[in-house]
A protein has these predicted regions:
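Membrane-proximal intracellular helices of multi-pass ion channels
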Residues: 1-178
Length: 178
């Protein structure tokens, strides 16, 4: 229980050797770092409410409902857009960061994924490979920590906010097949 709270709340208090964890336990810890904690706190991660909103979207879609509800409450579409964007962007950054590290570093994939999830979630836990990463690997971890502390949506807005304003003025309404 203590280790799961440490992973979710970015305490970074490491009392066990995560490098010695078996794969299922490592994956559970990675998931907890990925999700994070409540949006009202300072913990990193994607946030529990974002994951909950995405699950509500999937549940409503599978039941062919047009309104997205959770525990009998309708979730505003604007919040759903933010949650979906955050989920996709956060997952993409973890995937890209892990891919980049696996391309330049010679460690087990799950250890690299753990380091990336910890860095982006600003958790502070490690499987023990951080010190053995090369200069470029450490730079990737530093960039991920910066993005995680800044927030993935804030980072995304910094990259694409100006472009979005001009695109919205030019965009025509259309429908696509999904």
């Amino acid at each position: 229980f203590f280790q799961s709270m440490s992973a979710m709340t970015t305490v970074g208090f490491n009392t066990v050797d995560y490098g010695a964890f078996v794969l299922p336990m490592l994956l559970v810890t990675i998931f907890l770092m990925y999700v994070g904690a409540s949006p009202s706190g300072t913990a990193g991660g994607m946030k529990i409410t974002t994951l909950t909103a995405v699950i509500a979207i999937m549940k409503s879609r599978l039941r062919n409902h047009t309104r997205i509800t959770f525990f009998g409450r309708a979730i505003p579409y604007e919040r759903l857009y933010v949650a979906t964007s955050s989920f996709i962007f956060y997952t993409s950054i973890i995937a890209l960061g892990t891919f980049a590290l696996s391309f330049i570093e010679n460690f087990r994939f799950e250890d690299l994924l753990f380091e990336v999830a910890s860095a982006l979630g600003t958790v502070g836990l490690s499987t023990g490979i951080t010190g053995d990463l090369g200069s470029l690997g450490k730079l990737i971890i530093i960039v991920l920590m910066f993005i995680g502390r800044l927030g993935v949506l804030t980072f995304g807005l910094a990259l694409w906010a100006k472009q979005q304003q001009t695109d919205e003025k030019k965009a025509l309404r259309d429908d696509i097949a999904v």
